[in-house]
Amino acid sequence: MVALAVALGVGRFAFTPLLPLMLQSGSIDIRHGGWLASFNYAGYFIGAITCAALRVDHARMVRVALAITAALTVVMGVTDAFWIWALVRFVGGAISAWAFVFASQWGLRRLAELGAHRWSGVIYTGPGVGIVGTGLLVSAAGGLGAKLGWIGFGLISAALAALVWHVFEAAPRRVAPASPAVAAEHSEAVAVGHDRPGSHTRPSGRTAPPARSSASTHHARPDRTIHRADAIWLVVLYGVPGFGYIITATFLPVIARAALPGSPWPDLFWPMFGVALMAGALLAARLPLHWDNRMLLAGAYVLQAAGIASGIVWPTAAGFSIGSMLIGLPFTAITLFAMREARRLHGEHAAGLMGYATAAYGIGQIAGPLVAAPVAAHTGSFSPALWLAAFALMLGAAGLLIVTRVSKRRSHR
């Protein structure tokens, strides 16, 4: 949890509460702020898809990631050169992706060894803890400016890394390659305690060979066709929330300060997002496994769309508070539901599918700030970009409902 709080909560998301201070100091404008955000998300995308090529000890990689995250965070506060910021944010994004994957796998393995599967959800509250911490610290000490904020977060990250350094001891086992998809599958299996019915997997995690009959062979081809179509739509529609949530996740304090000038509330909306994220991480894995994942995804998209709309049509403290929680609550749940759907479609071979889906999500994240920042700079408001994000989420939800209906109709033929 601490590792993810540092790598993601600070390394990836501390930019959000500090961006208003950077804008206020004149060291950056909103357009370049959008570029910095997209550089970070591009780095995360590259880091995520290169994890499979890294054959390193998980614990050692987490240590390296924590140390680099702390150092890069300090660098953000000691220079004003945009090209250095861009490089730091890009590299920091890749490091945070590696930290997420390797820390997840290390933590889940340790919990399995200790027989403490029920605590797996706590690992994924880490980003929320980091978001809450950075948001509250900026709210309390924002007057010190962005530079000291970056340096302070870097020093705090270094202290937290030192605190857990001894925990990440190198494992004597053979190190297997890691990927976000494999980590995702592992986390989903551990979080729920058993596999989905029909996956041909025993609760112990060992694969049981499915019995094949002439009937199953006869229906194999149409089943594969249906699953292939569903898999394609999963990849396409999983990219939607990447675009949908990221505009708010990047610019929420900026948007709130513009709507509520002089109010102390804008600095608190980001921590509210973090609290909701933690709650969602703990609750999502406890939902019944027999519920349709695509319907759950559609519901999560609608929640995030409603959260975005709340801040636009009701630009008050209450509206932004509700919006922050509605966007944060399904943040982790969306990933979990997509993992489960990938496992339903491809069983033990879901890693490739989840990798493609993760790539689509990453592309959405990169595109969000690149669209929002120029629109805001041109119109003087984020509302058009936010409405576009909300519309995209609703369109994605509608697409999931249609795919679900068509898939069920085909399977009953």
Annotated model-derived regions:
Residues 47-59, 142, 280-293, 376:
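Helix-to-loop junctions at the C-terminal end of transmembrane segments
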